């Protein structure tokens, strides 16, 4: 299965229009949204940018509702639980806009998750660290897909306040204290950590390149072969890279 992955949007509503053109052109099987639709150090004071972004997200969700998996980023959670979960760039004047937009996404029949797996690939906003290798079930020599089920189910059923930690899939950044979880030789795809170009950290591919100076590349991953293709905003395939 070939999956188009949309990383951090941060009020750049045009990304949904380009993603739509990519889907119309290349007919990929599925779309995964990695979260962080909102907040921006550039556009964050502009409530109209919030409205346009949530409108575009709701439109995209409706069009691809049968072929889409939607994930939360830390910035969405900060609007769902403003009392306990906060992050930089938050605009409290946009709370109603963001929550109404999230409701519209759910109203087309979508569940918004924190983590998911498709084929041999695990998707989350920031990456799943090997902090989660401590789950007792993983010591029972499970089949890879069973282990991925245990991990993603545990994450998706954890309270947001308990995910407000550096090692969680909402906040994780690559480091040598907690390496990326690699149960069953999985590949991980995540955003959150800005980089000019996508890059591998062990088995984790970080694709948050949509910021000034970034390469602005969408990612397409084959969940069976692990082949990765990058597509720019003009719909050109830029280069391919496979996981070792």
Segments (PLM) and residue ranges:
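Beta-strand-turn-beta hairpins that frame and shape the catalytic cleft
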Residues: 1-4, 116-123, 201-203
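Active-site neighborhood of phospho(di)ester-bond hydrolases with catalytic His/Asp-centered motifs
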Residues: 5-7, 31-36, 69-74, 123-124, ...
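Conserved beta-sheet core of the metallophosphoesterase superfamily
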Residues: 170-231
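Core catalytic region of metal-dependent phosphoesterases/phosphodiesterases
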Residues: 6, 11-97
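A general structural motif
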Residues: 1, 26-29, 65-67, 119, ...
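Active-site environment of divalent metal-dependent phosphoester hydrolases
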Residues: 10-17, 39-42, 75-82, 129-131, ...
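Active-site-proximal loop/helix segment associated with metal-binding centers of metalloenzymes
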Residues: 89-101, 112-182
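C-terminal regions of proteins
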Residues: 228-243
